[in-house]
Amino acid sequence: LQIENYGFVSLDAEFCVYHLKSDGIVTPGEVSELSVGESEAKYVAASGKICAVLLYERAEKTAKIRVILQNEKNHSYDFPNVCFSATTGYTVVAGKKKTHFDASKKQKLTAQNVTEHIVVIPDTGGKIRVESVNKQYGHPEYRGIFEIDLVDKALHIINELPLEEYLYSVVPSEMPTEYQKEALKAQAVCARSYAIKQMAGKRLAALGAHVDDSVAFQVYNNLREDAASIAAVNETKGQVVFAENQVAETYFYSVSAGVSAGIKEVWFAKKDRSYLMPCVLLGDSRKTLDLQKEADFSKFLKDETKSYDANSPWYRWRTTVSEKQLQQFISEKIKSRYEKNPTQIQTKQKDGTFFSTGQTELGEIKKVEILKRGKSGVAVMAQITGSKNTLRIYTEYNLRNLFGGEKLIYLRKDKKEVSGLSCLPSGYFTIEKKGDSYIFTGGGYGHGVGMSQNGANQMAAQGKKCEEILKFYFSGSILQYQKSV
């Protein structure tokens, strides 16, 4: 366990958790109740180990989120060094030593010269500027404080700041701030709801963080906060989407194909959420329509069902890939996809059954076909027949990843050609063999679960308010004020 200003301390074998209520009564607790960033606590130590922790009843306070920064060069949390300054004067705390620096004074820390816990604290109103990192807007600036630690011969950097201020830089990184105000407010509520769910979870607890700053959670500080993003957050302060007696899972994506997916069909979740069910998005209504049959889904794409996303260039798209290209895409990525989750890539055995064996070499591709779709029409399983092996690939993301490549040229609905995408725009596509090539015809951009950002913007342009937008995309939900996390 890492304790602020104390470092890492081992837990005693008999380690216990207790609650101290405001009336002085002490009750036993569970280790699972410990949360990252917990400050309302006292620790009991003996012989260099923590024996117990006493959790105090929380007073109303500003919720803080801890974000571990990702090194975009190697897609890990490991940095060989970090160079920083600040927009104001700032203090560096190294162990018990505190040193104040002027704003113009740059500091460089390396994995070789960091031997203890480092905290960087800007003066009031200041931001930490990371000179050794580049984002879309240049060297990023961060509200809050930095904590820097040496972990396995590399530096880990955690940015701790108030949740609402974190959202200032999430909203512009996830949605263009030129979008309608009510759409930006809906995005802010979604981002807040998502963050609160992550703060209650423990995905990155071992690293001392709640989330990272990448697409693995929600993109943070890739674009600079601005007046529009700050207003969207401030005007919805504390508001979350609430459904099924808890803060909802507020997923969002760029453009729908005229349908909304469920989490079970996209991420193979154990069960769907009542507010995230597969359906067709028709104007102001949500119509249940089974698009699992290939012919029905193909007809749906061609009919271009009118929805809020119908004006988007990515509402419909097409690309052609040669057999040779497709074989190259798959061979380059199949091993890494298998290693991510072996159960999602299965090889045909001599008796006709399919198992995850690691034998993923296809040889020459003979046939590619979608064998299963979700109710929303999203492709969830495909079979690729090769001269050496026949594979079954599961999940829309695996299919998008394996069938796509940066060299593909997409013809969008607006007749413009676009390339450079590492995977297919969405899992809503059909495959047609023509000569020695395959034609992929699809719709939408993103996973298709939750709120379409483009759709939200169109709803706002037509006069819909933030709450109406959220209730449309998260059916049966309500907006609720969340006092604390």
Language model features: what each stretch is:
Residues L1-V485:
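Conserved, single-site charged/polar hotspot
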